[in-house]
Amino acid sequence: MSDHLVSDQAPSSPPPDVSLLLRAHADLTGESANLAVLTQGRAEYVAQVPGRHTMRTFTEVGNRVALHCTGVGKALLAAVPPAQASRLIGTAPLAAQTAGTITDPALVQAEIALTRARGYALDEGEMEIGVRCVAVGLPGTAPMAVSVSGPAARMTDDLITAAVSALSAAAAELRQQLA
């Protein structure tokens, strides 16, 4: 395994056939599906397939976002070794994107521990008001995360449960592609 696969300098190009995987998840949930990598201490979106609804979430490929307040960011933090996650989170208060953003580094650390334990991350309107995101990280590879996001009214707990199962399968398939 090359050194760049365990650093926070992941390549900015998606693995082959990732669009097919993302399309399957967008079709399953009706919501936008994303792939993000850890790049220079931020989550960088490298692929997205939009959901089928007129009102949907959209992120531009190449956009970099904070780790502490996004589903993909939390999944990325949970996918790297704990010491690296701690270094990325730091000790200073973190920037709030919404009133729901967790800004206390100790609480972010607790959220990452929960993410590791349950196997998925949630963004409950922490980056954008009214948007929920569920994401699964790919530990043991270049730090990557797959996610589904959409308006909170449609991203019900039942949809999130179904998405977690599907995203976990996608993460396993991506790990195989990268092996």
Predicted regions and their residues:
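HTH-adjacent hinge/linker in prokaryotic transcriptional regulators
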Residues: 1-40
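Conserved hydrophobic/aromatic positions in well-ordered beta-strands
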Residues: 36, 44, 134-136
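Beta-strand scaffold of nucleotide-dependent catalytic cores
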Residues: 45-48, 57-59, 147
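A short acidic/small-residue loop/turn micro-motif
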Residues: 51-53, 150-151
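Short, solvent-exposed recognition segments
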Residues: 53-127
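Short amphipathic alpha-helical signal-transduction/dimerization elements
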Residues: 73, 77, 81, 168-175, ...
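Extended hydrophobic
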Residues: 104-166, 170
